[in-house]
């Protein structure tokens, strides 16, 4: 999606200062619902050829890690939107999953109230529709100035609107007051919109949303990555430790709802779902093909369970490592690309990132290319470590009490040459027990 930043520097300063005097988060979140749900942002616009079984496969895969619903991002201009929404609702009902319509206001307009109302009248009472506090959830991408009053008044079933607001201060003024809460898209280090800052990721935007919502529902964003390389948008956020850091923040904040960005947005490289052969290619295959992210689902699962239970730390039930790394060092000049390296690339580190998921302490050994092996003592639980990137194969091992409990090699070598810039990451995982490699391991591609 193309983020349309509506912030000016003055506006940011104007709204940040009041937020600094806001009450502590614990008190502001005390009225949250005991029922916590996790959604995943799903791009309907790239699945025009999906069949019922495709939807069911994605949904059961999402269910397996604790995701409750897909937020179905749909555009008004796509002729197949009605067909795919119908299939999504049918599939969700069959597998006991839920869905939410997320109107993408890069395409919908404030003049589409009647059309949006018709969709809500059609699906608000559907068995597969996600209900929250007795009402059908509806969301958006942008759409800050849309007034939900007419939709609510003309839909027999109660509506619970949680639109995406670009500026949290909008929650207290104008059309956004008609909503029941808000969803933030600011899941990466930023000063607002697409501005890129060195990081680290903080909860400053979450704090501001909670403050301005003043007790209304806050749906917080979680995203493991963001890199895109189109001629109209070409940047990468500093997001290297987000796969665990952002979840740690969520366990501390305990927001009302969470939306994972995303399930299948290959264009922005933050997908956690399988790379589907049945999607239409917008050019992102250049950086998403053979770059699996499946291992992140393994990593997210215990965090989702912890969030729903109100725990501050995740519970690890089996030993595993999940690793992610770029295919080239950031300074490599690609020979056949008409575009420059993504904006923000210089802020990244040339590192290999490894999340250990251990039932008890162990020694992580990482060898990156021709670099000497690096040993890191890691405690039980989930911990993210990193080592300097080296050109060549990437190998991972965990030992405990002098015995190797798991080992594996990444399925992608780091190279010092390239044709096109690719700041997406390769994600793999290796589980303990029989020492076998799992998702993203050598030979699985």
Swiss-Prot record:
Give the CC-aspect GO terms: extracellular region
InterPro entries (UniProt xref): Glyco_hydro_71
A single Gene Ontology molecular function, please? glucan endo-1,3-alpha-glucosidase activity
Entry's induction text = Expression is induced in response to the presence of B.subtilis.
Which Enzyme Commission number(s) are listed?
Answer: 3.2.1.59
- Residues crossing the lipid bilayer are none
Q: Supply the Gene3D superfamilies for this chain.
A: Glycosidases
* Catalyses which reaction(s): Endohydrolysis of (1->3)-alpha-D-glucosidic linkages in isolichenin, pseudonigeran and nigeran
Query: Entry's Pfam families?
Result: Glyco_hydro_71
Asked whether the UniProt record includes Glycoprotein among its keywords, one would answer yes
Report the locations given in the UniProt record. Answer: Secreted
Name the keywords, alphabetized. Glycoprotein, Glycosidase, Hydrolase, Secreted, Signal
Sugar attachment sites are: 386, 437
The signal peptide, as residue positions, is 1-21
Q: Which family does it belong to?
A: Belongs to the glycosyl hydrolase 71 family.
Instruction: Outline the subunit composition.
Output: Monomer.
Protein role: Hydrolyzes 1,3-alpha-glucan predominantly into pentasaccharides. May enhance the efficacy of fungal antibiotics by degrading bacterial exopolysaccharides.
Q: What is this protein called?
A: Mutanase Pc12g07500
* Source taxonomy: Eukaryota, Fungi, Dikarya, Ascomycota, Pezizomycotina
């Amino acid at each position: 999606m193309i983020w349309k930043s509506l912030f000016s520097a003055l506006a940011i300063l104007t709204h940040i200062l009041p937020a600094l005097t806001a009450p502590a988060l614990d008190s502001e979140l005390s009225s949250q619902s005991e029922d916590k749900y996790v959604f995943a942002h799903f791009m309907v616009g790239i699945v025009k050829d999906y069949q019922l079984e495709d939807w069911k496969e994605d949904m059961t895969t999402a269910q397996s890690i604790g995701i409750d619903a897909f937020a179905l991002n749909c555009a008004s201009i796509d002729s197949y939107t009605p067909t795919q929404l119908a299939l999504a609702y049918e599939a969700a009902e069959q597998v006991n999953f839920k869905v939410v319509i997320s109107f993408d206001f890069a395409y919908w307009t404030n003049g589409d109230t009647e059309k949006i109302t018709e969709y809500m009248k059609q699906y608000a009472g559907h068995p597969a529709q996600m209900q929250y506090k007795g009402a059908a959830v509806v969301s958006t991408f942008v759409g800050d100035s849309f007034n939900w009053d007419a939709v609510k008044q003309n839909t027999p079933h109660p509506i619970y609107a949680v639109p995406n607001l670009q500026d949290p201060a909008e929650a207290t003024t104008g059309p956004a007051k008609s909503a029941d809460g808000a969803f933030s898209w600011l899941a990466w280090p930023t000063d607002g919109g697409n501005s890129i800052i060195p990081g680290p990721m903080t909860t400053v935007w979450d704090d501001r949303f909670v403050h301005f919502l003043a007790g209304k529902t806050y749906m917080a964003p979680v995203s493991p990555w963001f890199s895109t390389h189109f001629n109209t948008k070409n940047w990468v956020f500093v997001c290297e430790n987000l796969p665990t850091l952002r979840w740690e923040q969520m366990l501390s904040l305990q927001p009302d709802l969470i939306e994972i960005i995303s399930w299948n947005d290959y264009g922005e490289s933050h997908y956690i779902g399988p790379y589907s052969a049945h999607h239409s290619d917008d050019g992102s295959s250049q950086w998403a093909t053979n770059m699996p992210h499946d291992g992140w689902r393994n990593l997210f699962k215990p965090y989702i369970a912890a969030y729903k239970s109100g725990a501050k730390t995740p519970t690890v039930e089996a030993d595993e490592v999940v690793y992610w790394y770029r295919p080239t060092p950031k300074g490599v000049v690609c020979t056949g690309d008409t575009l420059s390296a993504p904006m923000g690339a210089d802020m990244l580190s040339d590192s290999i990132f490894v999340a250990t998921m251990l039932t008890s302490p162990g020694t992580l050994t990482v060898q990156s290319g021709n670099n000497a092996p690096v040993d890191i003592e890691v405690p039980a639980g989930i911990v993210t470590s990193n080592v300097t990137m080296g050109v060549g194969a990437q190998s991972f091992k965990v030992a405990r009490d002098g015995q190797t409990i798991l080992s594996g090699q990444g399925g992608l070598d780091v190279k010092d040459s390239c044709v096109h810039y690719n700041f997406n990451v390769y994600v793999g995982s290796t589980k303990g027990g029989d020492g076998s490699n799992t998702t993203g391991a050598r030979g699985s591609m």
